[in-house]
Regions:
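Noncatalytic alpha-helical scaffold of FAD-dependent oxidoreductases
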Residues: 1-493
């Protein structure tokens, strides 16, 4: 991607994808970017042999807690904890260029979706899939997990990427596209979680937006009825005659499930605000219609981290009044959780009260829609946590992504659940998570690897295409400069 990102996009919207792939960077921006790439290559080459590598970055949405790599505002690399080197990625945290005519953007790999959408909404455009939390980065969503309410019609974030400039573990910088020399890396990069390399920049497609989103909430009293409605939207693009540009849902229990269908709207007779005292997830139980600005819709879940702000007291009306609005956001809550994990404050309080220890169950899993009801019933019986987020998805392209083998054409539902549950007497940490992993496998699903996993090595590689990963690792990181996928996602290295 010297001064331009070149290549062809995945199938679907082929003409637009081709236009996106040919976006030219302005000369000054291109020169600054090339200088940043050269500096990163130099610092990477200077790392001691055998030293593990981490990015020193501002944010993280992973829940495999470990000591962070140090932030490096003024230096290209710093020695990290346990011998890990923290490479400074600050030069890759900006939107390099938005091309409204091509409906495309060239974006640094460490750019947050908050910054990206701030840049694109000025032009009446947004990425095809905008994950729910502001500080998720574009590179993180492509190499890890990213999903949202457009995923039934637009798939996953990698599917609207037309080109990536990647720094693999072997130290090269390569341009990967769907049909170029590094096409296998292009398709194998999703779900590699930084173990094959890091995306320095990505060229992505954009779609036009309207100023508002018109929401309609539909209630269901059984999981089966809810899954039938998801299948209806997948087949018809609407639910009970209402267009579905967006669809997700919230399950408060087996007999109280809501699907929220959104449609772009040029007008809004009123606009709700869930950045103040009102809380979005509670609103789906109320009036059946709602209107949000497009920006507020994109970040409707971030203000309360879905419902996970509750343990911090932020949903208490008095505390909410005192809690500054600028601190009602997911990265603040995540920092509080990380602090608690480091100091074991919640564990100590639980023990002091004489209560059983609690296990963190923080997962996103994809289940075929025809088995979605079975999963909800299994989860209610074995884990018993609520609410649960529901997000339908279907791959946009006809080609699978080797390391996360969802089947093209099949409709899945992502179930997200994030919290803690008490351990049964005699059980140890990991009990519920292992139950979830076994249940997901039995139902033909997969789970995202952004949080703790307990798979055996054989189970892991059977689920995540070990042979394909081994080929890519051999080609792009033959000396193992970067951690392996199993080592990183299961062993926490």
């Amino acid at each position: 991607m010297a001064d331009a990102a070149v290549g062809t996009g995945p199938s679907g919207a082929a003409g637009q994808a081709t236009a996106a792939a040919l976006v030219q960077l302005p000369p000054v921006v291109a020169a600054e970017y090339r200088a940043a790439v050269a500096a990163l290559r130099q610092s990477y080459a200077a790392l001691p042999p055998g030293a593990p590598v981490r990015l020193a970055k501002r944010t993280s949405n992973l829940f495999r807690f470990r000591e962070p790599a140090p932030k490096a505002p003024d230096r290209r690399a710093l020695p990290g904890p346990r011998g890990a080197a923290g490479l400074d990625a600050s030069a890759f945290t900006r939107v390099l260029h938005v091309d409204p005519a091509a409906r495309a953007a060239v974006v640094g790999g460490m750019t947050t979706y908050e910054d990206l959408t701030d840049a694109t909404l000025q032009h009446g455009l947004m990425p095809l899939v905008v994950p729910q939390l502001k500080t998720i980065t574009l590179g993180g969503a492509v190499t890890g997990l990213g999903i949202e309410s457009t995923s039934l019609r637009s798939g996953l974030p990698p599917e609207s990427v037309t080109a990536m400039e990647i720094r693999p573990g072997d130290g090269r910088v390569v341009t990967a596209t769907a049909e170029g020399e590094h096409a296998e890396l292009f398709r194998g990069f999703p779900n590699s979680y930084g173990t094959l390399g890091y995306a320095l920049s990505l060229t992505i497609e954009l779609e036009p937006v309207a100023p508002y989103v018109h929401l309609r909430h539909f209630a269901f009293t059984t999981p089966e009825a809810c899954m039938e409605a998801v299948a209806e939207v997948a087949a018809e693009g609407s639910l009970r005659g209402h267009r579905a540009d967006f669809i997700d849902g919230t399950a408060f229990g087996l007999d109280e499930i809501y699907l929220t269908v959104g449609a772009y709207s040029e007008v809004a007779p009123w606009r709700s605000d869930y950045n103040g005292q009102n809380i979005y997830y509670q609103s789906v139980r109320g009036p059946r219609e709602d209107f949000l600005t497009i920006r507020d819709y994109l970040w409707r879940w971030d203000t309360d981290w879905f419902w996970c702000s509750r343990p911090f007291g932020v949903q208490n009306p008095l505390i909410r009044t005192l809690w500054p609005r600028r601190y009602r956001r997911s990265d603040v809550y995540r920092s509080l959780v990380a602090f608690d994990r480091r100091h074991r404050l919640s564990d100590a309080l639980t023990a002091h009260r004489g209560l059983p220890p609690r296990e963190a169950v923080i997962q996103d899993v994809e289940i075929p829609v025809d088995r979605g009801a079975a999963f909800l019933r299994f989860f209610a019986a074995e884990v018993g946590m609520s609410p649960v987020w529901l997000c339908p998805l279907r791959l946009r392209s006809d080609s699978p992504w080797p390391l996360y083998p969802l089947r093209p054409g099949e409709v899945y539902v992502n179930f997200g659940f994030w919290g803690t549950v008490p351990l049964p007497p005699g059980q140890t940490d990991g009990y519920h998570n292992r139950l979830v992993e076994a249940g997901v496998g039995a139902l033909g699903g997969h789970k995202g690897l952004y949080s703790t996993s307990f798979y055996s090595e054989d189970e892991f590689w059977a689920a995540y295409n070990g042979p394909a990963y081994a080929r890519l690792k051999s080609a792009y990181d033959p000396t193992g400069k970067l951690s392996g996928l199993y080592e990183k996602c299961v062993r926490g290295r």
